[in-house]
């Protein structure tokens, strides 16, 4: 836990008064269940709190940033920013994935890379930060870590190429679309995945990304652009 405390201070200038909150935020249910006799707290309640404060801060930001955009557009953009995949990416950016405590089974099954776990971890950290430091510090952290990517347009006009590819290919009948991980590279906190997509056994595209889902979308985009062009 000392290494995590050092990371938080060095990168974000954060020092927790109540380190037990930090400990709880980084404890997955699988770890707590394996150490039931020790009555260790896990991070689900903090995740609940963090989710609420994240929704509030992002909603306020979008409301002030885009005064002329309708409610529907703001809701879609907020959903993209706070979705599981996005929050998992922020966890990796902060190197939080290095410090989460997992049960042995969860660790062996790749839990440290699982987007559900990493997204929940990010929210749990925000919950712990809120209890320890208050709303303004949480807001500053979110503005430091998340908002630069929002303002860079990373979450605008997100296209679901997997769905677009499926609709294009299945317009002439049922086909089997298969996504496979070709390779993984990089350290645990900055993984890069390469994924291929094939249709009825025929390779139609490849893509890379910081997560399997992002790599699948890139592969689908690559395939969609080629297949759509061939249909013209």
Curated annotation (Swiss-Prot):
Homodimer. Its cofactor is Mg(2+). It catalyses: Endonucleolytic cleavage to 5'-phosphomonoester. It comes from the Bacteria. This is Ribonuclease 3. CDD domains: DSRM_RNAse_III_family, RIBOc. GO terms for biological process: mRNA processing; regulation of gene expression; rRNA processing; tRNA processing. GO terms for cellular component: cytoplasm. The gene is rnc. Keywords: Cytoplasm, Endonuclease, Hydrolase, Magnesium, Metal-binding, mRNA processing, Nuclease, RNA-binding, rRNA processing, rRNA-binding, tRNA processing. GO terms for molecular function: double-stranded RNA binding; metal ion binding; ribonuclease III activity; rRNA binding. The active site is at residues 51, 123. It comes from Streptococcus gordonii (strain Challis / ATCC 35105 / BCRC 15272 / CH1 / DL1 / V288). Residues 5-134 form the RNase III domain. Belongs to the ribonuclease III family. Its EC number is 3.1.26.3. Its main location: cytoplasm. It holds the Pfam family dsrm. It is found in: Cytoplasm.
């Amino acid at each position: 836990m000392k290494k995590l405390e050092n990371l938080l201070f060095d990168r974000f200038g954060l020092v927790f008064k109540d380190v037990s909150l930090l400990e709880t935020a980084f404890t997955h249910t699988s770890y707590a269940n394996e150490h039931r006799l020790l009555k260790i707290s896990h991070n689900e309640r903090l995740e609940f709190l963090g989710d609420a404060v994240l929704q509030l801060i992002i909603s306020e930001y979008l409301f002030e940033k885009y005064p002329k955009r309708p409610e529907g557009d703001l809701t879609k953009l907020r959903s993209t920013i706070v979705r599981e995949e996005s929050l998992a990416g922020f966890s990796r950016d902060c190197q939080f994935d290095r410090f989460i405590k997992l049960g042995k089974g969860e660790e062996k099954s790749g839990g440290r890379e699982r987007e559900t776990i990493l997204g929940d971890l990010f929210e749990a950290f925000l919950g712990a930060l809120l209890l320890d430091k208050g709303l303004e510090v949480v807001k500053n952290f979110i503005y430091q870590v998340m908002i630069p990517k929002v303002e860079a347009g990373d979450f605008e006009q997100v296209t679901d190429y997997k769905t677009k590819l499926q609709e294009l290919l299945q317009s002439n009948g049922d086909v089997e679309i298969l996504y496979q991980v070709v390779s993984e590279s990089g350290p645990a906190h900055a993984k890069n995945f390469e994924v291929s997509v094939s249709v009825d056994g025929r390779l139609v595209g490849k893509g890379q990304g910081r997560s399997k889902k992002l790599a699948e979308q890139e592969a689908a985009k690559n395939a969609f652009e080629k297949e759509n062009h061939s249909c013209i």
